[in-house]
């Protein structure tokens, strides 16, 4: 009975041929090594070019927001608000205000008055690691 042809053996041979073909194709397409790829060199370049690149973004407007505090409320509570209603915020009196650029916390500060208008004095710039820590809360 060992002389009988097994259809599964024929399928395995066909699969082996397909794998061999795929491997040879992969070798032929990946013959160019990564070291041969040409990349533009960083550093040691023209510093004035970098300053010109920065000048391109200097006039892009951003939205600066100063947050006094936040709170959560239900729709029912929202609909009950009238003129004179007081909404309690989570920020404490005297606590630094959050300064956001395009919705991202970048600094903290305190309220000041400048020519009869509100202003904010920056008291602390938030480091990138501190921003990540605050976002994970």
Curated annotation (Swiss-Prot):
Belongs to the FliN/MopA/SpaO family. One of its GO terms (molecular function) is cytoskeletal motor activity. GO terms for cellular component: bacterial-type flagellum; bacterial-type flagellum basal body, C ring; bacterial-type flagellum rotor complex; plasma membrane. It is a peripheral membrane protein. It is found in: Cell inner membrane; Bacterial flagellum basal body. FliN is one of three proteins (FliG, FliN, FliM) that form a switch complex that is proposed to be located at the base of the basal body. This complex interacts with the CheY and CheZ chemotaxis proteins, in addition to contacting components of the motor that determine the direction of flagellar rotation. It comes from Escherichia coli (strain K12). It holds the Pfam family FliN_N. It comes from the Bacteria. This is Flagellar motor switch protein FliN. Gene3D superfamilies: SpoA-like (2.30.330.10). Keywords: Bacterial flagellum, Cell inner membrane, Cell membrane, Chemotaxis, Flagellar rotation, Membrane. GO terms for biological process: bacterial-type flagellum-dependent swimming motility; chemotaxis. Disulfide bonds: none annotated.
